Amino acid sequence: MSVQEDGAARPEPDVLRRHDSLYGDAEKVSNNKRHGAGGSWARTLQLAFQSIGVVYGDVGTSPLYVYSSTFPNGIKHPDDLVGVLSLILYTLILIPMVKYVFIVLYANDNGDGGTFALYSLISRHAKIRMIPNDQTEDANVSNYSIEAPSSQLRRAEWVKQKLESSNAAKIALFTITILGTSMVMGDGTLTPAISVLSAVSGIREKAPNLTQSQVVWISVAILFVLFSMQRFGTDKVGYTFAPVISVWFLLIAGIGMYNLTVHEITILRAFNPKYIVDYFRRNGKEAWVSLGGVVLCITGTEAMFADLGHFNIRAIQLSFTCVLFPSVALCYMGQAAYLRKFPENVGDTFYRSIPAPLFWPVFVVAIMGAIIASQAMLSGAFAILSKALSLGCFPRVEVVHTSNKYEGQVYIPEVNFLIGAASVAVTLAFQTTANIGNAYGICVVTVFSITTHLMTVVMLLIWKVRLPFIAAFYAAFGLAEFLYLSSILSKFAEGGYLPFCFSLVLMALMATWHYVHVKRYWYELDRVVPAAETTALLARRDVRRVPGVGLLYSELVQGIPPVFPRLVDKIPSVHAVFVFMSIKHLPVPRVAPAERFIFRRVVGADAGAGHRLFRCVARYGYTDQLEGAKEFAAFLLDRLKVFVHEESVFACSRGDNDDDDAMRRAQAMAEEEKRVIDAEAERGVVYLMGEANVTAAAGSSVMKRIVVNYVYTLLRKNLREGHKALSVPKDQLLKVGITYEI
């Protein structure tokens, strides 16, 4: 039986749709087990320990610079310390603990977190992606589980309808998502700079002759080593992260208890929030400005959510409440107690408050902790960009998977070079942690605010929470983050401009790439080749059937791409087995190999002059790794034979079940076709790719011509080529040039 495809997407009977899928019972595949999803308490404790090294390096090293950034001009009143300590404690409780640990972590996408995970979660419940490549079979992927809005809660259905019908809403959600990604990239630039510089600055306590410039160059040397080692990944040294950060937490907690006992235990009254009110009454605008330093105590909080895929919710909740919060709270309280007696040392509080015998051990662990914090932030930045790349939101770059044991550990050489150069430049330009902190805070709070807005959509659309709770969530966290952001923006001219400029450039690149990507897809979709024209092309006298298997890649998941007629015109030959191949990334973290492919027959041997034409969509999640070309082709052809077999079984089941001769003929034809596929595979596989030159159509605006003809073209020519991303051997590659005017 031959299922013809007329080029345009058309509704199909349910039974036919089921048959057209490669795996008839894909919906029966059990949901993939996430790493650390559930399990025994022993396993949870193990994951909680491991998470200490991966998740908390950044927030755990914040005590190195929070007080110096909060009081850049010194402490004017002794009780200001109590007010700031109270702000620090309640900021730690409100945002990392209440918001992230006990609310946001539950909005994960099959165990994965982060800004893109929230966006993909929303996009599965409402069609907000701008590329129309949704297919009915996608819902059968086990990780694609969704809960339709309840009929009892019309609000969720109303929100869904508004999101799907409003281009402005789609663009707004996409914009804040790429803004969050851009800010995380800024975070990846500033975290190494501020963490390493603040840790190295402590050496001046024992070597006072060192100038600040020399400290900066020592920091630059460490940064150079850090970024040079990224290509090796964290797999080989990752096992040391948790012990080192655990030792760090024990040290800062112990030193904090020591300072509390020796200097002023009464600083514990900071748990009374009235001291926050007194602090603002006493200092007014200066107290508001100081919030930009206070917020640095929660840098790295987003990592708890972004790195969720490697752990589980219980593990992170346990490690935060039992290890991180007590340790850093004791550290901040101890520093405040020390500063009550020695307020003149606020510029270097951390190292001045360390008992003399512990200085060198703490200094060494601080350097290691700063490097680990930087490494964790960089790994997270690479992972987020990898997700953006798979969803068509970032230009093609090389993604190197650095671990065979742990998924999600990737390294992107081009991005590593740019972030490394930017981090070194920031360190050399700003010189002090106080100046870098002005820029750092903007990245941190902007990501917090974006998560709050996306979480509000999740609550409305997916969780279907009662409105009073949603209003309370948005008001509490939205107001707090607005206050912090407004404070940081007051330092725009003192370094706050840096992440804005960085993010604007990165957003412009991402938006340009995605805009042309969408326009190109629509251009191809509007010009799909009808099945009748395909059959006519194959029937031409000058078109020869050549041995082997041809895989023609395009982004279309429905219809024959317009590059095919051009290929036949230029090279009047078609392979005996020809597959129109599409690589599609679903808004889910992973797709099981058993659910990878969807096949449809385009033209059978009887109608195609001996050619066998198929369409295939290979589906991947945004954390999945593409196989090498050889392995991919072998797996593809193996599953193609399964499809041929299932097609014959389905054809027999629709006919007269008593006609044994017909069944035998159908089975014999299927066996013959499988033999043909094997024989042609032995003759070799050729990969064909359309090399599209995209230009702005005549009459386009000046801005569109600049974006398409210059910016996009520059990106496309200077970044990774498509065949390299698919690991296609050059001796098996054939490119077909074509021009699209969009």
Curated annotation (Swiss-Prot):
Q: Which residues are glycosylated?
A: N259
How would you describe this protein's topology in the membrane? Multi-pass membrane protein
Q: What's a BP term from Gene Ontology annotated to this protein?
A: potassium ion transport
Tell where it localizes: Membrane
The protein's matches in InterPro entries, at most eight in alphabetical order, are given as: K+_transporter, K_trans_C, K_trans_N
The family database entries (Pfam families) matched by this protein are listed as: K_trans, K_trans_C
Q: Which GO terms describe its cellular component?
A: membrane
- For the keyword Glycoprotein, the answer is yes
Source organism superkingdom: Eukaryota
Q: What does this protein do?
A: High-affinity potassium transporter.
Q: Would you identify the family this protein belongs to, as annotated?
A: Belongs to the HAK/KUP transporter (TC 2.A.72.3) family.
Q: What is this protein called?
A: Potassium transporter 19
Organism of origin is Oryza sativa subsp. japonica (Rice)
Q: Which gene encodes it?
A: HAK19
